[in-house]
């Protein structure tokens, strides 16, 4: 399995300047047939300008689940995090969701 992959971006999320997306390869275990890094980056870019309430937090990170996020007519869930005092979004998982 590949290690985490890093991509430069210019986004503002939760009023924070974000300059990097770090994608964990976890999604490839079950979702490689429907999700890839390109799709994940497109989903992350849809967060730009948004304010999101965290689902959980610890001493180091805030954790988020955002769904549905639409891309190319399909619905996805994005599981991501922000590290306090850091300028990146970490993507923990991403996968297709059925439309409701």
Predicted segments, located by residue:
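Ribonuclease/tRNase effector modules and their secretory precursors
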Residues: 1-100
């Amino acid at each position: 399995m590949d290690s985490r992959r890093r991509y430069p971006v210019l986004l503002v999320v939760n009023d924070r300047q974000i300059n990097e997306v770090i994608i964990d390869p976890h999604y490839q275990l079950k979702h490689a047939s429907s999700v890839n890094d390109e799709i994940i980056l497109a989903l992350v870019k849809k967060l730009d300008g948004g304010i999101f309430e965290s689902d959980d937090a610890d001493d180091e990170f805030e954790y988020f689940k955002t769904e549905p996020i639409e891309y190319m007519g399909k619905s996805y869930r994005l599981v991501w995090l922000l590290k306090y005092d850091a300028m990146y979004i970490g993507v923990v998982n991403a996968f297709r969701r059925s439309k409701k």
